[in-house]
Amino acid sequence: MIRILIAGFALLPLLAAQSNYPPVQSLIERSKSAMNRTARVPLAEDPAGHTPNFVRALSLTPKAQKPMADLFETMIYQGSVEPELKLAIGLRIAQIYNSPYLAVHTERRLRSTERGREVLALLGTTPISSSSKTPESLAIGYGEALTKAVLGVTNDQFAAVKARYNDSQVVELTTTTCMFNYLVRFVEALALPTEPWALQAEDASRRGFHAPEARISLISDAQITAVETAQKQSRENNTLGVGFANSMRAMFLNPAGATAWRNYGNASREYASVDRPLKLHISFAVSMVNGCRYCTVHQVVGLRRAGVDPNKLMAMKKDDSQLSPRELTAVEYARKRTRAPNSTTDADYQKLKEVFGEQGALEVVMQTANFAYMNRFTDGLRLPSEDEGVKIYQEIYGEGSYESYRVKR
């Protein structure tokens, strides 16, 4: 009890700002009625009766089911940041986007440990105060700011986070935030119902976390192996021609998370009802909405290498006049989903299915969510574009166009 009270007083600044989030308990109550929702996609069979619906929703892309489950578990329970802080970031994102489904899946895990209950008690309805410098408020505030805007973390806020967390931990906090931004868009796009078992606290007896002893990040065997594997794959399938991308160089500071994300992405890309150029149109549109310079450059490079005319690429920076009806359907959906994850309707998804088929509609959802992740990771960390990407971008948009577009530090 004393520990809880001390933690509560230490984190009172968390509750100091104007209230603007739904209470956690109200989201949990709403998740009960969401058990009756009808998913917009067929759900895979669940003989054991304990598979999350966000995994079952990949029945049309079955090779991605296990990597999705592994991604969720890895991001939360591996690394050097305590799982409860990462779950708190996920629950805060559920509050920001008003997602009962994401709330119940993070709250049940927080509720299962003493530390989780301490953190849960501090997640009220208010945004994080910028004056608070406790480890908890820095981590949750970082995830909150990055969720609200790709460039939402200020230099001062980032410096405060860096003063408490090392580079690997900052990447871990970032990928955690990115993963939950992916997940909330995925589950809300597909109107996934709450599983009855999700209302019960998780059995935490099999979990364990040990804080690292070293004051700095150590290069692990896993990190070395993961980077070697990724470099080999990059050489074999270098579709953008930029080599080992800076996004990967940064991501592998958290090797377990980077490997889980790559495994999920590789499995997802085995399905191509929607062709690569159209997926690049989707990610270009999402990156433009989010103002992500790094990912916009990559999509321009990809589209140009796929044979898209430079005149069309020029027009796409201004309006949709050069898009085909098929492209426009995907792009308009992606923009709507990017701006407000819980805003799309059954009619919106039905239109996707009519144009792209059932599997193609799911691929549009996944590609949109991919860049909710990647935009926040790359420009959130202010990663520089690779020289080859800048070269091609300026060949299309003119000399100096990249400098005028890049993030001002």
PLM features: what roles do these ranges have?
Residues 1-2:
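N-terminal secretory signal peptides that target proteins for export/translocation
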Residues 16-409:
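Hydrophobic alpha-helical segments
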